[in-house]
Amino acid sequence: QKEKLEETARIECAALPAYARLELKGMHLDTARWRTAVAANDAEFREKRAALLECFKGTVEQDLFGEPGSDWGSDEQIKASCRKAGYAPRDLRKETLQTERDPRAKVIMEFREARGLKTAHGLEFLRFLHVADGRIHPDFNQIAANSGRSSCAEPNLQGIPRTPRYRSCFAAPAGRKIVT
């Protein structure tokens, strides 16, 4: 009462049954479509990685099999290759790379985006399917974020890419509809 949050508490309490239902009922995932999306993303990842390796040819050490020894997973690895190639971006944040005129910035940015999709939304995502009903039962946190917004974890359904490739995987099963 002191903070005048009665209305907020009322809204939060009213939303609780909906969150509980979402967690308990789960979310249908079209696994065949998900596998297709993952395969397409993997192909894009390989394409972006090849473009990155071409861009920084000669700056990455090779392993015993002649393959590039870097997985380009860390900023330090990317910065080291950039320095060897005579390119010095201010930093590797997307916002910074978008302002760079050097075409290598775009190559780095596209690779990192494809790598992020591969890491967060690959076949590993399917481990969240419940064995009993084949649905995803995420954990919703109504007021966990500092911003006051709700969050979702295990998995983070709010972080699913906003592309038809991924969003279409959350289709209603036959005879049902999703209302958004």
Question: Can you name each region flagged by the protein language model?
Answer:
Residues 1-165, 171-177:
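Conserved "right-hand" nucleotidyltransferase catalytic core of DNA-directed polymerases
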Residues 180:
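C-terminal substrate/ligand-recognition segments
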